[in-house]
């Protein structure tokens, strides 16, 4: 080990500012999205039936995390592919990669969303034997399946944004979508209009839709020639 370790060198910090300009906004972009879902669980503890609401929303969050892995992988792949193609000056190839990944994510999201909707009456039993919890999970499935579809599409759009170096723009989009649109609507629906856990999830669905629309507009208006 000592023969291969040459000790730390200041050269490792060379051009660190360029790295941080991408790394920090990228971390903020991801964290803002993940934290918004965690806030739902915290807010559910303030509802009239906290144990039931927290159980159901935890089930939804666990399931959406599982379903998110496939589009997350597509997002990581398209991020690498787009950045490589743009770096090589192949703007048309980068654009084609983005379009193919978007089509794949849309088809995958529709399939997963449809499956979740079809098994809505039995999915709850994978987590709980309590009839009240299972019935509540079943009633949440239309909203949950819709959010799964939108989340799958935005995952690839986020990957395209990272591949193009739009981390800062993506962070602003996520901030606005989740903390200006999603969470406030969730709070109003859950606590003012008394929709409970459904209101919380409907609010975050509005946030996902806003995020997807913003990222889609950014991608649609991209001049791929200038990006390369």
PLM features: residue spans?
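Helix-terminus/linker motif at the lipid-water interface of multi-pass membrane proteins
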Residues: 6, 27, 31-62, 66, ...
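Short alpha-helical transmembrane segments in multi-pass integral membrane proteins
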Residues: 1-24, 82-148, 181, 189-228
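Hydrophobic alpha-helical transmembrane bundles that constitute the permease/transmembrane domains
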Residues: 19, 27-42, 46, 66-77, ...
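Hydrophobic alpha-helical membrane segments of integral membrane proteins
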Residues: 172-173, 202
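General structural feature for long, well-ordered alpha-helical segments within catalytic domains
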Residues: 12-20, 24-27, 35-40, 53-55, ...
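A short pocket-lining beta-strand/turn micro-motif at the edge of beta-sheets
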Residues: 167-169, 185, 198
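Short loop-to-helix capping motifs
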Residues: 49-50, 130, 166-167, 196
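Small-residue-rich hydrophobic transmembrane alpha-helices
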Residues: 56-120, 152-165, 169-170
């Amino acid at each position: 080990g000592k023969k291969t370790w040459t000790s730390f060198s200041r050269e490792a910090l060379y051009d660190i500012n360029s790295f941080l300009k991408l790394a920090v906004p990228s971390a903020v972009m991801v964290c803002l999205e993940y934290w918004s879902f965690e806030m739902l669980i915290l807010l559910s503890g303030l509802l009239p039936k906290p144990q039931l609401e927290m159980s159901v929303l935890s089930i939804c969050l666990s399931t959406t995390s599982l379903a998110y892995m496939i589009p997350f992988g597509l997002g990581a792949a398209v991020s690498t592919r787009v950045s490589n193609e743009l770096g090589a000056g192949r703007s048309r190839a980068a654009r084609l990669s983005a379009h193919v990944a978007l089509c794949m994510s849309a088809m995958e999201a529709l399939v997963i969303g449809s499956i979740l909707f079809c098994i809505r009456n039995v999915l709850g039993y994978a987590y709980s034997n309590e009839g009240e919890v299972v019935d509540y999970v079943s009633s949440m499935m239309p909203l949950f399946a819709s959010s799964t579809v939108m989340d799958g599409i935005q995952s690839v759009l986020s990957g395209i944004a990272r591949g193009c170096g739009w981390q800062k723009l993506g962070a602003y989009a996520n901030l606005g979508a989740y903390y200006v649109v999603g969470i406030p609507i969730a709070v109003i629906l859950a606590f003012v209009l008394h929709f409970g856990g459904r209101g919380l999830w409907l609010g975050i669905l509005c946030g996902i839709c806003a995020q997807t629309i913003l990222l889609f507009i950014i991608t649609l208006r991209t001049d791929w020639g200038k990006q390369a």
